[in-house]
Amino acid sequence: MSSSFSSDASQYQAENTVNKLFSNILHTNISTTKSTTNANQLFAQHGSSVKKNKKNEAKRIKKNEERTKAFNKFVKYNYIKNKENKNESDKKYLSKLVRKNVNKLNSSSKIDDFEINEEFNIVSSELLDQIKPKNGKRLRKKLFRVNENDERAKEFNEKLQKGVISYPGLTPGLAPVDYNESDSE
């Protein structure tokens, strides 16, 4: 038997109206065996399921797009990485990828707890000290050379003041070209 109603809600509303009419005419109580959902509730239920379906479909599509993007990026990275000759755009892409990944790591590795952060800093500094090469001899040589240079600089300045050595650009006994005595007073 085909129904002449356009939706379940309109059929329910019509049946409910007829039942109320008969109960008023026959002076009987309306049977309460059926649930008491009205047309608006049925519309809302139907609409919410459609909204949920659309929302779920949108989530599924977005997830698929993200997977596709990630896969394409992975393929591009592997292609560029395995290339023998990398051109300028490939190098730029790789450096951009490195910066992006470093930023992700830095943003995700922030520690909120002060004590844990302090302990992490101590452990990382100990590891860096162990990994760092020992530069004892060279450092001593560099420091020794710096002291030698200081002696040389002192000797040079003394000779300049005595007038033994002339410095390029200055004439002994004369003031520089742009020198004003009124400026120094």
Swiss-Prot record:
One Pfam family cited in the UniProt record for this chain: RRT14
A single Gene Ontology CC annotation of this entry is: nucleolus
Q: Where is the protein found, in the record's own terms?
A: Nucleus, Nucleolus
UniProt xrefs under InterPro entries:
Rrt14
Q: List UniProt keywords, sorted A-Z.
A: Nucleus, Transcription, Transcription regulation
| Broad class of the protein's primary localization | nucleus
Q: So what does this one do? A: Involved in ribosome biogenesis, probably through modulation of rDNA transcription.
Protein's name according to its UniProt entry: Regulator of rDNA transcription 14
